[in-house]
């Protein structure tokens, strides 16, 4: 195990001491808990967090590209479904049924979407 001397602020020293004292109050023995061991544990934890952040930065994931691709797929799907609804509304099997008129279907879809969107993104009174 390597030995390292480092300087920390008084505030950090106090916080580490508070952790040690709390652990002792919880029943840890003096040989089980120490300032050095606690500081080492916190340093290791900090290094894990640092490594995780560096991995995230190096990740090939690009949020902007993902959003662009997702929006493109949504727009294509919306356009395709609109065409299919238009074709279906002209079918002789549903002609004369107001439930399957194109304008009625569009209004029904918009209403259902609005209800679902409000469920996840409630409107504020400020808007």
From Swiss-Prot:
Signal peptide: none annotated. InterPro entries: IHF-like_DNA-bd_dom_sf, TraM_DNA-bd, TRelaxosome_TraM. Its main location: cytoplasm. Keywords: Conjugation, Cytoplasm, DNA-binding, Plasmid, Transcription, Transcription regulation. It is found in: Cytoplasm. Transmembrane segments: none annotated. GO terms for cellular component: cytoplasm. It comes from the Bacteria. The keyword Cell wall biogenesis/degradation does not apply. CDD domains: Tra_M. GO terms for molecular function: DNA binding. Belongs to the relaxosome TraM family. Conjugative DNA transfer (CDT) is the unidirectional transfer of ssDNA plasmid from a donor to a recipient cell. It is the central mechanism by which antibiotic resistance and virulence factors are propagated in bacterial populations. Part of the relaxosome, which facilitates a site- and strand-specific cut in the origin of transfer by TraI, at the nic site. Probably autoregulates its own expression. Plasmid specificity is conferred by the TraD-TraM pair. Homotetramer. 2 homotetramers cooperatively bind to DNA although they do not contact each other; cooperativity is achieved by DNA kinking and unwinding. Part of the relaxosome, a complex composed of plasmid encoded TraI, TraM, TraY and host-encoded IHF which binds to the F plasmid origin of transfer (oriT) in a site- and sequence-specific manner. Interacts with TraD. Also interacts with TraY. This is Relaxosome protein TraM. It comes from Escherichia coli.
């Amino acid at each position: 195990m390597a030995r390292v001397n480092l300087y920390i602020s008084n505030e950090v020293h106090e916080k580490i001491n508070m952790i040690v004292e709390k652990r002792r109050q919880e029943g840890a023995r003096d040989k089980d808990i120490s300032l050095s061991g606690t500081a080492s544990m916190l340093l290791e934890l900090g290094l894990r967090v640092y490594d995780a952040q560096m991995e995230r930065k190096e990740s090939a994931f690009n949020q902007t590209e993902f959003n662009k691709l997702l929006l493109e797929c949504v727009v294509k799907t919306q356009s395709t479904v609109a065409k299919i609804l238009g074709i279906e509304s002209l079918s002789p099997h549903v002609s004369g049924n107001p439930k399957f008129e194109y304008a009625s279907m569009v209004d029904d879809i918009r209403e259902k979407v609005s209800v679902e969107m409000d469920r996840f993104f409630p409107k504020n009174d400020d808007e």
